[in-house]
Regions:
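Membrane-proximal bilayer-interacting regions
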Residues: 171-173
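Acidic catalytic motifs of isoprenoid enzymes
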Residues: 1-101, 108, 112-149, 155, ...
Length: 206
């Protein structure tokens, strides 16, 4: 089930790149999405509701980006709903709701941290950035506000996790929520994240 969700997300992300990206980047994504299509079709048959949710949310997000939406809440919510939709129905509605909330707030956190990380590049290329659209003249002045809303989402994700029994995954998920994500956020907001990614990429290639 997790593999199906990953395949669906990968396929629609590639299709989104085809729609939004420059010619050569779009061409590469078009080829990759073509190669992924058989696996995507099988995954979509296994998880049709998730497939519909991803397609719908990406279309909604694309529309918000094209209109230059200044609303952080609307754009982050649209992305977060994609991850929330990945939650499989559990044995109780309370567990399903907790899992949806965990994924939703992690998704919201990812979207906003990624937007901050992309500020410089998006400004250089003229690409839409929800933070720049919300604070066109005072991005840096709203750093604390953004970190506060990120902490709010992280705390809600942690609260949802506390309601779940995740078996052997419990420790790993808690480690991500309490250590991994805060560390990434600190690296992003201090401008060190890109250097860390580059260094890790070199190690992977060796």
């Amino acid at each position: 089930a997790a593999a199906d969700a990953g395949t669906i997300l990968s396929y629609w992300k590639l299709r989104d790149t085809v729609a939004d990206g420059p010619f050569w980047k779009g061409t590469a994504a078009r080829v990759l999405s073509f190669l992924l299509r058989p696996g995507y079709r099988r995954a979509a048959q296994a998880r049709p509701e998730f497939d519909r949710a991803v397609r719908s949310c990406l279309e909604e997000l694309q529309a918000l980006e094209q209109e230059g939406s200044p609303s952080l809440d609307r754009t982050a919510d649209t992305f977060a709903r994609i991850l929330a939709a990945a939650a499989l129905p559990a044995e109780s509605s309370a567990r399903t709701r907790a899992l949806e909330q965990l994924l939703y707030h992690v998704g919201r956190w990812i979207y906003l941290v990624d937007a901050w990380d992309d500020l410089e590049e998006d400004g250089r290329t003229g690409s839409y950035n929800p933070i720049a659209a919300r604070f066109p003249e005072q991005v840096e002045a709203n750093r604390d506000y953004l970190r506060t809303t990120l902490l709010h989402s992280l705390n809600l994700a942690r609260s949802a996790c506390a309601l779940l029994e995740l078996g052997h995954w419990q420790g790993a998920v808690e480690n991500i929520l309490y250590l991994g994500l805060p560390m990434v956020e600190e690296l992003v907001f201090t401008g060190r994240w890109k250097a860390v990614k580059k260094r890790n990429s070199r190690r992977t290639d060796e």
